[in-house]
């Protein structure tokens, strides 16, 4: 083998990198264990803040770098974001104070609570009632609707424009949230537009380790403002006076407030260094500190800055900000401080030793009559993170022409002063203006890290939403089926892995089997290491990618070993057999991996959420499995053989010696029968789609989910009987009709069920949620399944004894149009490019047609099995986003299997290239299928070992996935033999037959 040195170097680098990145997971687990022994929460946090892994990395960095589990496996953050449609309307009206407009707005808000109509219809109706004879154009002929609404516009035209703008605002907010969360890569966000709740988004984020940062990221409306400022020396005397008046007891201020009221969000500007009095940092209230606070209620906590510090007036510890806010924003402060003064905190704590919890207070000057900033962020057209001339991270911005003019005027009027750059009420930077800035090019610089600038640039370039997104619901969700299911899944996966290793030894002898097993372990180790380096969270679709990767890795070793067996059978020596075995297997391995890689790359580029997570893991696994199976194992084999070791090594055992050897099944002669069988199977699936449909989860149908723990183990059928007819719709076109309600068992303890219903799902009234929970409580209590004294206790997930709701959700269709479109397009593009690659690689359309026909039929049958089987077997077969991952895995496996068969057909056709017209094409196809039959069966069995183990031993959260995979592998294996190959034969055979006739008609010269 050539380039052995390069292979060794890459292997060493991969090993070291994987050890390094995976060590963060070990370190985090160790630190968490140590911290758990500390009872005092402050001391526990201090311990975490003090640790330095390897002397360099903080606990927070360890958290960020470790490989985590996704929301479906570990839990994470679940929020509902609301983009207020009334706020959007008010923005479009330029915040007019017209009495009729304001009254109509309030009426519409009240009616929206109980009306099925959308807000715009309610508002238009209310406006016509409140202001008869007046036109909507009088309100909405604003700068925001310039070009769409004029004073001459009709009410119909205005209403149309409002609908377009509101839809655009909601879509934009969806895109904003998607773009911001996508920065986390494989974290697999689940973003849903909640049907029936206009302007609401639900966002699930697995394994979020910094909820504060995510809250800022999600709620940041990119509401950027540029403010004029006071000089600190102008404001300090006022603060001193306020401090004295407070000390005199003119007003009562609670200076013992904790920092719980003030959660500083965002980042900070560059500021001069300072030193707080150490007494201020003391944790206890000693007599001296108490006396100091009595003498100086404000300035004992807020340290002012002597000298010229521009707009920065002082510093304070974050725990003191709540008390300071009460003083500087209180009624006494309004009497003393300038009326045009606006005090805002910095966004990020001051850097430096013992100053990570210290924030700056800035003095802004209000110069407009309406109290708004003189320049706002809607003039910013682009924003990107880069570095200044000193190599420090910053964010560069470009403004539009209007903003450039206003910015030039603003900077010209404030030369020598600071301009505060404020995002959502906190100061990011307050740089000194050295001169007029023209051209619209500016930058936000300060005490930033690279991560800070990336977050800020991402927020700014996402666009300025007319109404900020607000978190109206937030919860930390546990794993889908609990820790027990996860533990079962891990155990089953481990058992499957061991069985797979034993299988390779049984089939290929101890040494070759162990070599394949070591390659498998290395593949898994490297894959996890690379995922950890990406700071990825492992999700169920990600596991799908790993499962497919293991199959690909085993497949490569099986291909190599089967070719080596063939060479040894021909009487060749071990050195030659190894060389030719690896060489002859290379093209099949390369083609099968590349077709899988094509699918993965397209899914990564066009997919979102679970599809993207699956694709990322799959791509990593494909590349690494190719390296470990093709290069690492060969390196070891050749090293041993070069030392005259393993010269008599066999690649069979007594069990496998004659397995599928010298078989000659006539597969092609039975294609009519197999086509008929496949056609009937597909027809049955289509009929099932039409008659039974699919068991779609609320991800697709909308509805309410309640995961409930019961007070005793019970049969799920008994719960179904109790819930039957309990929910009756009271609103909408289904009023008076029973709501669709399903109950399934979760876990294995018999005490956890999930109740799903579409009860009043079309209602916009939040009170319906409480009604639904009350109905659920009454029904379960009547049946004796819960014994809580009140519905309030039943709704409290912390009160498990007696039964309670431990997780709930109300959703519309999960996969919004854009995600559905991207998912469909990604699969279609993958199929198209697979078709194109096989056409170019195999130089015949027959192979392309055969592979695509096989993929389409296989996918149809897998989905059809879910349609046929749901409700008949004892576990959920719902169609959800995890199922998408399973289908993609099936497609990847099937094309891998098919390409290997095609590669052998191509090789055998090449042996007859000079007399192909006279060759027996059917025999060549049959021989090729028979020659790869051992490989086909071994690969399928080895992968099925993994999946059957997971299916039997794993929890419910992975059972439907493994079920789909089992069906897909069985069908895909048969398809590569009985569908893909015969279709290719029929297309290729006709072409060769036509060529033979043409040659036969050519006259032979005498």
Residue ranges, per PLM feature:
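Small-residue-enriched core segments of transmembrane alpha-helices in multipass membrane transport
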Residues: 12-15, 426, 513-535, 546-553, ...
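Juxtamembrane "pre-transmembrane" interface segments
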Residues: 204, 439-443, 451-499, 775, ...
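Cytosolic juxtamembrane regions of multi-pass inner-membrane proteins
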Residues: 551-595, 638-643, 873-938, 986-999
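Interfacial segments of transmembrane alpha-helices in multi-pass membrane proteins
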Residues: 2-4, 395-396, 400-415, 419-420, ...
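Interfacial helix-loop-helix hairpins and adjacent transmembrane helices
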Residues: 1-21, 27-67, 87-128, 156, ...
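Hydrophobic alpha-helical transmembrane segments of membrane transport and translocation systems
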Residues: 8, 522, 529, 566-587, ...
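Non-transmembrane, solvent-exposed regions of membrane trafficking/translocation machinery
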Residues: 22-28, 49-50, 64-75, 81-424, ...
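Pore- and gate-forming transmembrane helices of large, multi-pass membrane proteins
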Residues: 177, 480-500, 552, 572-608, ...
């Amino acid at each position: 083998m050539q380039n052995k040195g390069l292979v060794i170097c890459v292997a060493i680098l991969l090993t070291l990198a994987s050890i390094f990145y995976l060590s963060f997971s070990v370190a985090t687990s160790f630190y968490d264990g140590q911290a758990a022994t500390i009872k005092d929460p402050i001391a526990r946090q201090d311990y975490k803040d003090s640790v330095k892994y390897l002397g360099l990395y903080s606990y927070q960095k360890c958290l960020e770098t470790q490989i985590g589990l996704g929301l479906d496996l570990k839990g994470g953050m679940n929020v509902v974001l609301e983009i207020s449609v009334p706020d959007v309307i008010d923005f479009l009206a330029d915040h007019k104070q017209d009495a009729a407009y304001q009254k109509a707005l309030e009426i519409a808000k009240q009616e929206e609570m109980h009306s099925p109509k959308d807000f715009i219809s309610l508002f238009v109706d209310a406006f016509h009632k409140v202001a008869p004879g007046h036109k909507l154009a009088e309100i909405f002929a604003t700068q925001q609707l310039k070009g769409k609404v004029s004073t001459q516009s009709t009410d119909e035209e205005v209403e149309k424009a409002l609908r377009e703008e509101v839809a655009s605002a909601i879509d934009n907010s969806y895109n904003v949230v998607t773009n911001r969360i996508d920065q986390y890569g494989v974290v697999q966000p689940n973003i849903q537009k909640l049907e029936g709740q206009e302007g609401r988004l639900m966002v699930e984020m697995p394994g979020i380790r910094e909820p504060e940062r995510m809250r800022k990221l999600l709620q940041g409306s990119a509401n950027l403002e540029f403010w004029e400022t006071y000089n600190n020396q102008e404001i300090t005397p006022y603060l001193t006076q306020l401090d004295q008046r407070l000390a005199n007891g003119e007003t009562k201020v609670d200076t013992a407030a904790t920092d719980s009221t003030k959660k500083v969000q965002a980042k900070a500007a560059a500021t001069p260094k300072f030193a707080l009095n150490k007494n201020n940092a003391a944790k206890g209230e000693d007599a001296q500190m108490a006396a100091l606070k009595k003498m100086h209620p404000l300035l004992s906590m807020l340290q002012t800055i002597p000298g010229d510090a521009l707009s920065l007036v002082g510093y304070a510890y974050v725990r003191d900000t709540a008390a300071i806010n009460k003083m500087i924003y209180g009624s006494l402060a309004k009497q003393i401080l300038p009326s045009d003064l606006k005090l805002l905190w910095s966004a990020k704590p001051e850097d430096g030793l013992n100053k990570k919890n210290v924030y700056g207070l800035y003095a802004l000057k209000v110069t407009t009559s309406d109290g708004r900033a003189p320049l706002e962020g809607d003039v910013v057209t682009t924003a990107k993170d880069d570095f200044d001339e000193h190599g420090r991270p910053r964010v560069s911005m470009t403004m539009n022409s209007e903003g450039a003019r206003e910015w030039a005027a603003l900077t010209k009027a404030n030369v020598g002063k600071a301009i505060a750059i404020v995002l959502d009420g906190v100061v990011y930077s307050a740089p000194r203006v050295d001169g007029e800035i023209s051209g619209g090019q500016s930058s936000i610089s300060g005490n930033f890290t690279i991560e800070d600038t990336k977050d800020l640039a991402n927020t700014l370039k996402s666009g300025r939403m007319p109404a900020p997104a607000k978190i109206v619901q937030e919860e930390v969700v546990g794993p889908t089926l609990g820790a027990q299911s996860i533990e079962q899944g891990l155990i089953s996966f481990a058992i499957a892995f061991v069985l797979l290793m034993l299988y390779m030894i049984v089939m290929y002898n101890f040494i070759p089997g162990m070599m394949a097993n070591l390659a498998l372990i290395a593949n898994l180790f490297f894959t996890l290491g690379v995922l950890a380096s990406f700071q990825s969270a492992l999700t169920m679709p990600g596991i799908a990618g790993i499962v497919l990767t293991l199959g690909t890795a085993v497949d490569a070793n099986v291909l190599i070993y089967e070719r080596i067996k063939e060479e040894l059978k021909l009487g060749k020596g071990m050195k030659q057999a190894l060389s030719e075995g690896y060489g002859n297997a290379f093209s099949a391995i390369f083609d099968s991996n590349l077709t899988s890689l094509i699918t993965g790359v397209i899914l990564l580029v066009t997919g979102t959420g679970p599809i993207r997570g699956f694709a990322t893991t799959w791509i990593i696994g494909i590349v690494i499995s190719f390296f470990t199976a093709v290069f690492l194992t060969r390196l070891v084999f050749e090293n041993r053989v070069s030392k005259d070791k393993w010269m008599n090594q066999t690649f069979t055992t007594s069990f496998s010696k004659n397995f599928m050897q010298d078989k000659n099944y006539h597969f092609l002669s039975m294609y009519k029968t197999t086509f008929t069988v496949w056609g009937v199977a597909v027809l049955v699936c289509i009929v099932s789609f039409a008659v039974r449909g699919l068991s779609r989860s609320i991800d697709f149908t909308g509805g309410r989910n309640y995961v409930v723990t019961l007070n005793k183990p019970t049969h799920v059928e008994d719960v179904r009987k109790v819930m039957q007819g309990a929910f009756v719709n009271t609103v909408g076109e289904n009023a008076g009709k029973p709501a669709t309600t399903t109950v399934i068992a979760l876990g294995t303890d018999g005490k956890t069920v999930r109740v799903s219903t579409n009860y009043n799902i079309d209602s916009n009234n939040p009170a319906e949620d409480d009604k639904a929970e009350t109905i659920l409580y009454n029904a379960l209590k009547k049946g004796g399944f819960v014994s809580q004294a009140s519905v309030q206790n039943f709704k409290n997930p912390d009160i498990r004894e007696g039964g309670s709701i431990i997780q709930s959700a109300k959703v519309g269709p999960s996969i919004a149009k854009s995600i559905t479109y991207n998912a469909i397009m990604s699969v279609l593009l993958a199929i198209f490019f697979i078709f194109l690659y096989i056409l170019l690689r195999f130089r015949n359309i027959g192979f392309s047609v055969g592979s695509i026909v096989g993929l389409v039929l296989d996918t149809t049958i897998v989905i059809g099995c879910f349609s046929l089987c749901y409700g008949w077997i004892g576990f959920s077969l719902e169609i959800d986003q995890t199922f998408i991952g399973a289908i993609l895995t099936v497609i990847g496996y099937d094309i891998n299997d098919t390409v290997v068969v095609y590669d052998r057909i191509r090789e055998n056709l090449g042996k007859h290239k000079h007399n192909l017209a006279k060759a027996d094409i059917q025999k060549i196809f049959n021989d090729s299928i028979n020659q790869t039959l051992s490989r086909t069966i071994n690969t399928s069995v080895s992968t099925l070992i993994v999946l059957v183990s997971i299916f039997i031993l794993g929890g419910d959260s992975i059972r439907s996935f493994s079920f789909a995979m089992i069906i897909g592998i069985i069908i895909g294996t048969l398809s590569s033999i009985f569908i893909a190959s015969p279709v290719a034969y029929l297309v290729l055979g006709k072409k060769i037959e036509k060529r033979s006739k043409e040659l036969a008609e050519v006259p032979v010269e005498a």
